[in-house]
Amino acid sequence: MPELRSRTVTHGRNMAGARALMRASGVPGADIGRKPIIAVANSFTEFVPGHTHLQPVGRIVSEAITAAGGIAREFNTIAVDDGIAMGHGGMLYSLPSRDLIADSVEYMVEAHCADALICISNCDKITPGMLMAALRLNIPTVFVSGGPMESGRATLVDGTVRTLDLVDAISDAVNDKISDEDILRIEENACPTCGSCSGMFTANSMNCLTEAIGLSLPGNGSVLATHTARKGLYEDAARTVVDITRRYYEQDDESVLPRNIATHAAFENAMALDIAMGGSTNTILHLLAAAQEAGVPFGLDEINEVSRRVPCLAKVAPNVAKDRTYYMEDVHRAGGIPALLGELHRAGLLNEDVHSVHSPSLSDWLKTWDVRAGSPSPEAIELWHAAPGCVRSSEAFSQSERWEALDEDAEGGCIRSAEHAYSKDGGLAVLKGNLAVDGCVVKTAGVDESIWTFEGPAVVCESQDEAVDKILRKEITHGDVVVIRYEGPKGGPGMQEMLYPTSFLKGRGLGKTCALITDGRFSGGTSGLSIGHASPEAASGGTIALVQDGDRIRIDIPNRTIDLLVDEAELSRRDQALNGVYAPVNRERKVSAALRAYAAMATSADKGAVRDVSKLG
């Protein structure tokens, strides 16, 4: 039977000082050494709408842990708002913050000998950073996120009512046909509430994937941040972490440990969900990183195999269905992630040998929570009726609206069955070829099928800023392939997101007639023929460093290939001319010591852009 980890600091005369400090921090003396210490990793910050409401959430979770028989000790991590950091030097810090968050959780848990962990995450790098930490620590852990934002609604000058999200505010801002007054109305209404941005962007994608992996409760990825139903989710998560902590330490039940939940089969299921729902390409980066922390051999080849057999069952903003745009509130109304998993299960596309923090098996999980399975629990039906309040609010639990009816239409609704899939090809794909020997990724759910095969001349940019300038100066034309290089994990450093270039292409009317390729990455809000994570990156001598203006590039999504149409002899000549120096030309960029440290250890995107400490020698 494993001893409580906290016994190290709660037992023995020589730990009198540690116990004195615990008493000073509010722990009742009678509880010290008798109850498990549950670390509450909160990520509250006033910088990020996805986290601005989390301060009271930490208290709710801590109080529920106390009531369930644990000792809750809350601390905070940092949280970068990618939307605010976007388009300037601040974005260099976003991806490196993932590893910093993972380290900070590890530091706090190990320094204080916590017995278990509950992670209150939400936005882009916070959930994956905490996931990496949980798998690294391998102590009983439950995830519970802050929840999605409601979609926006703006009444324009001409009386037209538009549904909106953050990406609309960015792309419309460069559309000369939209008036300043309408831009202001769009800006004021695109992000109406607290929560992670309303589409299937990176934050919501990752929170949904924690459900599929088995480390969070049903509804974690889809119950709106503003809804009162989310309070019950926080309390249930708190009770669950105390329960699995007891099962491990009192019953020697190792099945509750993160590495025994997040198995290879669980990662495959999560990737199947990701592809079916057309999640952010960033999720691939983060799942690769998490798998390494879990010791699970899971790479781009496995992801490519899954992508070839799983269809696209949901198109959620920024991906657009033919008749309408769906948001996370629509996914929730359709039964949330259990409904998507249920459709995949009925199509024979999920591994059965998985379990979760809340259910002993996949079949038990879906029987209880899938509203389309025929016998969902009353609690499930109640949960999926939680609807948007359509009132501006930055407060959690500020509304309790309910849908009159659920969307159970598997033929034409938000979530489709495999038989009625949006496309037989899934929403994400891995491409390989001489331009990306180790692979690159594209969100096919966001690409118009008319350009799934594409060939055009390269327009080379040594930075995201150069690409933005060329787009805004109208130097990019229909048929071009914009190549942005030296923006990878090492070359950036920090692997910036490219939401502005893709949004500006869309705003200029080039979203369906141009391609963009980069060794950087894209926001979850990106759509169009946007191919990222080209590996090896330019700074590591990848072929993308050899591309010249006018070179023809061919993209073939159905056949999963991407090629620079330049013969090998010429590429060899160009490589020799660089003389081993792979660096951007005429780019001035301030790089801090913190970023240089990240770059010194960073791996390419095909390895998850994780740090490789062996590079330190």
UniProtKB/Swiss-Prot annotation:
This is Dihydroxy-acid dehydratase. The active site is at S523. Mg(2+) binds at D82, D124, K125, E497. GO terms for molecular function: 2 iron, 2 sulfur cluster binding; dihydroxy-acid dehydratase activity; magnesium ion binding. Functions in the biosynthesis of branched-chain amino acids. Catalyzes the dehydration of (2R,3R)-2,3-dihydroxy-3-methylpentanoate (2,3-dihydroxy-3-methylvalerate) into 2-oxo-3-methylpentanoate (2-oxo-3-methylvalerate) and of (2R)-2,3-dihydroxy-3-methylbutanoate (2,3-dihydroxyisovalerate) into 2-oxo-3-methylbutanoate (2-oxoisovalerate), the penultimate precursor to L-isoleucine and L-valine, respectively. InterPro entries: Dihydro-acid_dehy_C, DihydroxyA_deHydtase, DiOHA_6PGluconate_deHydtase_CS, ILV_EDD_C, ILV_EDD_N, IlvD/EDD_N. Its cofactor is [2Fe-2S] cluster; Mg(2+). Its EC number is 4.2.1.9. It comes from Streptomyces avermitilis (strain ATCC 31267 / DSM 46492 / JCM 5070 / NBRC 14893 / NCIMB 12804 / NRRL 8165 / MA-4680). It is an enzyme of class 4 (lyase). The gene is ilvD.
